[in-house]
Amino acid sequence: MEERTFEMELAGRKLLVQIGKVAQQANGAAWVKYGDTVVLVTACASKEPREGIDFFPLTVEYEERLYSVGKIPGGFIKREGKPSEKAILSARLIDRPIRPLFPHGYRNDVQVIATVLSVDPDVQPEIVAMIGSSVALSISDIPFNGPTGAVAVGLVDGQFIINPNHEQREKSLMHLVVSGTKDAIVMVEAGAKEIPEETMLDAIMYAHEYIKQIVEFIEGIVKEVGVPKSEVILHEIDKDLEEKVRAYATEKIYNALRTAEKKERNDNLDKVEQEVLEHFKEEYPDNLADIDEVLYNIMKEQMRKMITEERIRVDGRGLDDIRPIWCEVGVLPRTHGSAIFTRGQTQVLTVATLGALGDIQILDGIGDEEAKRYMHHYNFPPYSVGEVRPLRGPGRREIGHGALAERALEPVIPSEEEFPYTIRLVSEVLSSNGSTSQASVCGSTLALMDAGVPIKAPVAGVAMGLIKEGDVVSVLTDIQGIEDFLGDMDFKVAGTEKGITAIQMDIKIPGIDKEILKMALEKARRGRLYILSKMLEVIKEPRKQLSVYAPRVIRMVVDPEKIREIIGPGGKTISKIIAETGVKIDIEEDGRLYITASDLRSGERAKQMIEAITKDIAVGEIYLGKVLRITPFGAFVEIAPGKEGLVHISKLSKKRVQKVEDVVKVGDDILVKVTDIDKLGRISLSRKDALPDEEEEERN
């Protein structure tokens, strides 16, 4: 393919796409430049479908290269390792809008790789990668019902900004990413500072106008350089087999579905499956997989039919009903804060831990953020769904869910000045039947309040679903697992009483329009307010006192010029304070100093030691010092951490002293008076001028 270059203006910057320049052996490849950010996106597909699977094997990789920001990787190996959390979240951003646009039943392996080659701080590389993935797939022979476009939206001074720069992102009240086709919205992800539903909806629709321009631009590229799509050969089920299975199993599946409790319902469905397979195994011994597929289709149809025609859900709820909620705080005696949040059969334990500011997470990546003082981690063990599988650390889903819950609480976390602690939340999913990420949001709020963290407002979350059959649209509140699995949308909305703090929308149909979004957001608001009311019945506000097991923080402000003295040569002075008191000390360049101690007493002791260092030594002042070492001509005495002076042998006593050891020894605490400080800062001390006469006489 000959090299071709395409350009368009997007939100005040030039978007440049080069085709045929690099990676020509991939099915599709696009070199995309926006500002000074450059991303190479490739798409490849296997020639044959993968046998024996019932899912679409799509993988998306987002490769961060530190050379893109002029960095050399740290560590001994000096090369990029496993993907960072940011890279995993970016890969999910690329994956989610394109996944529903592949043909249903397509089983060929498809791999999309976005490699970040150059990063302009004013241009987010993940947005460029999302556009590039659409280009690479659209021009290739891989079956894909795109193209899609993607933009970020900020809100600064009441104005929406498309693809905001670094400074605008810092000021923005929202960070919204929207992807869609020319006709509909496909994916939404946002973090916001209590934004009203109407504003969020307007932002999404505003983004769609720019998405249409991007899609039109990509369609023009496809017309010029696109190749014909390969034929999708889908497996067809024998019609006679399907009719017989439907006649035998439909009513049985319907009855099995009408079970409120998840485990019992799954057991009933398993029994129906075994009964049907047993019934047809002699007639269709080689078609058991086809029978399973027909049973799945029947289950999906019946579940959706119950909702669209009967307006009732499998567990007996109406479309707007929320499952029973119960909460408990302070469930763990030794942690700093803990809570259990239960909604139906979804249950999450969230634990809050408070640490020193030195415990912040340092991020070595290509993004804006360099350190995190607040973090949320989400664990989804196999027992939560009654399964057995190896424990291999967090997967992409767990990282994504943890980040969503983290984003939901971020706007209400107090600032470092208000609450000088590092905050870590861990959500353990104890039982899962849909919407565990939003249960983690609720559990996080309760755990923070139990820990005494002065959050600005409580946050709750709810997951909305969608069943769309023709013109019949059914929006579901508080979806459970089967409704997520067999439905058309998973729309998670978290926020306070005032507004939205985080949203995440994924769909399985080609897109949804403004009216569906509006309905979902309004129902989510009502659901969120109800859930908040149930949470506040358990704990109305953050506790006034921290847990007795939480560390105590003492704040000080010191002269920045004194920081060097506090640290001492090679860190000697500060290390000594830490060793003697058992505290942690964090010092900022502007002179802010934080002492984190397990108890207030040791913290106050460290504070006194630091004050002694920062206080100027004055001639005529008397200090209690410690003898550090002895020489033939006198004793060196430390009168403050890192500050020592000489008591000459002639100044040890009013009487003549033959040997220094006759009066003091190493380790003695003695009173001394400062008699002189020379131009070099050397301190002269006198013992004989510091002690009362009677004490001197008693000593001798």
Curated annotation (Swiss-Prot):
Record-linked PROSITE patterns: KH_TYPE_1, S1
Catalysed reaction equations from the record: RNA(n+1) + phosphate = RNA(n) + a ribonucleoside 5'-diphosphate
Recorded superkingdom: Bacteria
CDD domains: KH-I_PNPase, RNase_PH_PNPase_1, RNase_PH_PNPase_2, S1_PNPase
Gene giving rise to this polypeptide: pnp
Alphabetical list of Gene3D superfamilies matching this protein: GHMP Kinase, N-terminal domain, K Homology domain, type 1, Nucleic acid-binding proteins
Residues of the S1 motif domain: 620-688
Similarity-based family: Belongs to the polyribonucleotide nucleotidyltransferase family.
Protein name: Polyribonucleotide nucleotidyltransferase
Required co-factors: Mg(2+)
E.C. code: 2.7.7.8
GO biological process: mRNA catabolic process; RNA processing
GO cellular component, one term: cytosol
Residues annotated as domain KH: 551-610
Cited function: Involved in mRNA degradation. Catalyzes the phosphorolysis of single-stranded polyribonucleotides processively in the 3'- to 5'-direction.
Keyword Cytoplasm on entry: yes
Entry's localization field: Cytoplasm
Major location (coarse): cytoplasm
Residues reported in the UniProt entry to bind Mg(2+): 484, 490
Broadest EC class assigned to this enzyme: transferase
